[in-house]
């Protein structure tokens, strides 16, 4: 069966790493064209070396290209501002969009958690790197619990892997991730913190997830977390638990007060993760960026499979 042709818009680090993943691990998609705005960018040069069509004239260059009419899926790795323009044009032309920017026009999407709900959406959003790493763990606790009252994530990433866009949008990162912890992860209230670690040599991404839940015991949570880690590892091999899940119980004799929510009885879980990148283009310590491109590719493969089945 013919694979679905795809385009990548944005030839920077994220777009180039995604390109290399699509070249190295082809499944349901065929990368047809890479779009940039700098004719001399490394990403476009690498695309040409691999025999992939390119344009340095942005979205308009893509729309004028003979391959455009064959594109079924487009990945946008530009900026939130540019994405709003791109989405309108691509949607009008019947192209499904996987959004790697903070624009969040489409629904938040984390492949092993809620991708099956969004296969027919014209636009899906990849949340944030911290969201892709930690929301599966919140969801793992939520699916075996009656309620997750609160979930907090702390994402620590190498300072070297945080470009100017990340640094300029720290507040947006925390707000978006916290909201997705609630909407996708299933927590009543979510909070997100990001730390830029200046250590040399650079540290790989590390994440800590805290949940306050009721209605499940430690063994249920432990098994659910292990199962979810295995699901994420299918597309991010470097995703793993740093140590066994830690638990603390709160009962009627030692209730925990949650600001704004009242007293809590149940289980506090602490899940510690690390994410090592595959090194397809970005260095392996950039697990925070790698998990975004890997999740985007996994999402695209599912969208493409849906299109192929309907053809």
Swiss-Prot record:
InterPro entries: Acetaldehyde_dehydrogenase, Acetylaldehyde_DH_C, NAD(P)-bd_dom_sf, Semialdehyde_DH_NAD-bd. Pfam families: AcetDehyd-dimer, Semialdhyde_dh. It catalyses: acetaldehyde + NAD(+) + CoA = acetyl-CoA + NADH + H(+). The active site is at 129 (acyl-thioester intermediate). Its EC number is 1.2.1.10. It is an enzyme of class 1 (oxidoreductase). GO terms for biological process: catabolic process. NAD(+) binds at residues 11-14, 161-169, 288. GO terms for molecular function: acetaldehyde dehydrogenase (acetylating) activity; NAD binding. It comes from the Bacteria. Keywords: Aromatic hydrocarbons catabolism, NAD, Oxidoreductase, Plasmid. Belongs to the acetaldehyde dehydrogenase family. HAMAP family: Ac_ald_DH_ac. This is Acetaldehyde dehydrogenase 1. It comes from Novosphingobium aromaticivorans (strain ATCC 700278 / DSM 12444 / CCUG 56034 / CIP 105152 / NBRC 16084 / F199).
